[in-house]
Amino acid sequence: MFERKIINDPVFGFINIPKGLLYDIVRHPLLQRLNRIKQLGLSSVVYPGAQHTRFQHSLGAFHLTSEAVQQLASKGNFIFDSEAEAVQAAILMHDIGHGPFSHVLEDTIVQGVSHEDISLMLMERINKEMNGQLTLAIQIFKDEYPKKFLHQLVSGQLDMDRMDYLRRDSFYTGVTEGNIGSARIIKMLDVKEDHLVVESKGIYSIENFLTARRLMYWQVYLHKTSVAYEKMLISALLRAKELASKGVELFASPALRFFLYNDINKETFYNNQTEQGSACRGAGGLQELAEGRGPGAHPLRRGAPHPQHARRGHRHRAHGQDPLQPRGAGGCQSGDPSAAGKPCGEDGRDGQGLSSAVRLLRPMGVPFVLFG
């Protein structure tokens, strides 16, 4: 008997998830984590309705991929059940490596490590847990499988990822120009020489797709206010890393603190090492902290301070001091006794570069929980 889980999606209606491998992926904590990651990052400052998550997007992309596989098979393109399941698994996990605030953090607190790199690492980790059941899905994700059109459904110029985020982002922002005819496009898909193609009568739908994508970038993804908020967040994080490198004690959640006080790049990320000591070393510790686990990690409510800092933050606020500023009499808290009472940094700044940006971002809960 065919068992399935039915999820009611506001964009596509009922989404069927077969019990078994795909359902196990959906239930996995690493995918469920995406319920706490907004799809559009800071765009909600412009479009208050843009509160949807990357988990919702992953389910939508899965639904479109299922429709596309059925359509391609109906046109005589032979697709094994194992291949269909693998490409569905790949699209479910394609964004599993995303952190908060969309792409803002990728080149700010971690250098040279993209969300695709992290997605692949987490896929391989889940694959080990599932005794190799995701090997084919990983091959498709990495474009190492002979049937190239399967990878193009996951990542390409006309992939199911783009089709879902255009429709979903249009729905939640209210920008109707992004509402594409995804059903029509999928019906026009076919395979020629192992590559995804579109029938000639679907050319106008593709033109509308390209136009909609351009308009969504113009009106939503690159909106001047959203970009300005992203720049402020980047400035705050870069300033925080600068202060952390000088030994200044900063107010941060355990996970964010790990990234601020350790130089994480692609080499250290994959070599399971960090140059500086921390409560949790290596990629294993990095994953635990990023998931809100590990030594010193506590589950944090969005927008709430860490429990061990709550009283300290209250004390600072009672004295009119920003809890994100270095402790002490308006100066640095470092190992250098001569630094007491002096402004932080050689340039004479007292952390105002960080503080100013943080005050502007505080209404969104940004300074308190970045990885909670």
Located regions from the model:
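Short active-site segment of divalent metal-dependent hydrolases/proteases
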Residues: 93, 97-98
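Short alpha-helical catalytic segment bearing the HExxH-like zincin motif
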Residues: 87-92
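Histidine-centered, transition-metal-coordinating active-site segments
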Residues: 1-86, 100-106, 110-372
